[in-house]
Swiss-Prot record:
Ranges of biased composition (kind: Basic and acidic residues): 19-29
Annotated spans, Disordered: 1-29
Domain F-box: start-end pairs: 29-75
SMART domains (alphabetical): FBD, FBOX
Protein name (record): FBD-associated F-box protein At1g66320
Top-level taxon in the UniProt lineage: Eukaryota
Pfam family, one: LRR_2
Chain ranges of the FBD domain: 378-428
Amino acid sequence: MDEDGEKHVLTKRSSFPESSDKNSGDEGDWVRRDLPESLLFQVLLNIPTKDLVKTSVVSPEWRHLWRCVPGLDLDEADFTQFDTLVSFIDSFLSINRESSLNKFKLRIYCNHDRDKETNNAHMARWISAIVEQNVQHVDLTWLPVEVPPILYLCESLVTLRLCGVVLANLEFMYLPLVKVLALEWVIFANELALEKLISGCLVLESLRFCKCSLDNVNVLRVRSQSLLSFNYYGPSSRDLHFKDLAVTIDAPKLEILKLSHQVTSSFIIKKLSSLVEANIKVEFNFCVGKKFNPNDLSKRKMILHFLVAISRVKNMTIAASTLEIIYDYSRCEPVPLFRNISLLRVEFYQDRWEISPFFLESCPNVKSLVVESDYYTKKRTSILSRPRRLLSSLEYVKIKSSWDKLEMKLVSYFIENSPVLKKVTLCLDGCSRKESVVLRELLTIPRRSSSCQVVVL
């Protein structure tokens, strides 16, 4: 122990082939580093346990160091037999039963021939042990094993990630310190079980939810006064097992919203006054052989309220499939204005460029626009006619695409209708046309902004 009361550890000089210290001895000597034990363990916590075990050959002083690291990060694939994994975990938890545990991360993807009762018994034993050790971070992937109730009453837990496990309908869940909650392919007893889990996280700041067809959740209700970030996503394969899915969000402090699930029918969101960033890829279930119906007033009302709820966002990424539905909606009634948007990113997976200019008219203060597409087709669609108003705030445009004549029409649209445009960046990756031809066409476009610079990459 030194003057600060911190233990120091010995590390081998492996980074330097030679030492400038004449008294340091040979290259293979051990050198005492001024690295406190607490800081060393903090670094080692970020290394998988299988790699930590390898450090035991570094020196005699490191032989048992990995046993003292307050965390486990294990993958079943690193063990030739499941029983060996079980023994390893049991041994580690037993050795450290009097110490606090920072992290418990376990990935088991297949049950093989093991019976359900045995798996649940292992899970119950380990969860009970880590809760007693005041674990702070839990990351469990085990298909499909039931997590014991004691985990949902862990008052030391800060982050919780569950994947593929089963969650029973408990009467009470209390996780007073959990700030990060990630639920992927989790099977819930019912919707109420999920609601209790979310509401039981009293200081929740980040929620990630991956939808699966067997999770028993048709209506996802997110109510949190502390939530800052919400990410909702699911498979894009148009799974026909999904029926009448809905998401309701009541999170007044939400700053980041990511929605990516085409077959969810309804999103009911209370106005998000603090929203900074949104990534929207939803189709309101119009993707499964359904089309927007102007006579469906309830659907139109839902879309309107959805747009109003996110209209205060500052930076938005939006999919072309979502824009297409908004475009269809706009034929029935006006689209709300997105006055706060400064950066707009549009991701095209279909050749529907004409819907981009229409939405820009609803973003009167947008300064930067990024248009991306990795889709190429010989099909041609027409850009909308000249805008009802100029793009008076647009300063920067970047277009990344396979590039053809249609993109040139889009570039012309921006250059001709943006009076304060400063820079247009064109990425010609995968372009079948000669760069010289593209450059000649660019020179013929009349520029409304005299200071506009066009850069071709």
